[in-house]
Amino acid sequence: MLRANAAMRSLLGSAAFAVDQPTVPEMEQTTLDAGWTVEPSGALLLVRHRPKCMHDIPAEALGGGEYEINDVYVSLDDLGRESVDFLPRAASRGLYFARRMLASARGLPGSETLLAAVAIHVDVDDEDFALQGATIRFFSRRGSYPDWFDELETFTLEAIAVLDMSDVRT
């Protein structure tokens, strides 16, 4: 079930959130098209993000290892940062990408515990704001895994949403 902090809830409630059908830039589309691989250890990794030389992630560290590798930057450059609807559209794109990747993992061993954390930088006064994209990280709740998403309101400079398989439309 989707959980979101106040900043993300604000973006989701905006009329601009549903302005258009979300799109995915070409580079991220290749990540969607390539899909997932299941490592011998059971780790769920994005094919395009899997290191060429990689040691197995131990069972006791599966979620944390997945989190480090399944780190996707989704460009927002084409959305027009000066536009009033930029942030809601950025959230829409990030959530759309996360749902598509979760859907493509459905049925893989361990996917029932797979989560997607979507982050959109909302501090418009930050000098690096124009460089920010959407960050989506995928990890399972197996072994040690990031627990800092348990309390989303601690994130004040980012709109954060955490999705699981129940958020994927069939």
Give the positions of each predicted feature:
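N-terminal leader/targeting segments
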Residues: 1-68, 72-73
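Pocket-edge structural micro-motifs
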Residues: 48, 76, 140
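Generic hydrophobic secondary-structure signal
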Residues: 44, 69, 74, 97, ...
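A short linear-motif detector with a strong N-terminal bias
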Residues: 23-25, 52-53, 94-96, 115-117
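Generic alpha-helix signal with a bias toward terminal, lower-confidence helices
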Residues: 20-24, 48, 79-86, 126, ...
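Short glycine-rich, basic-tinged beta-strand/loop micro-motifs
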Residues: 61-91
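Acidic, proline/glycine-rich low-complexity IDRs
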Residues: 92, 99-170
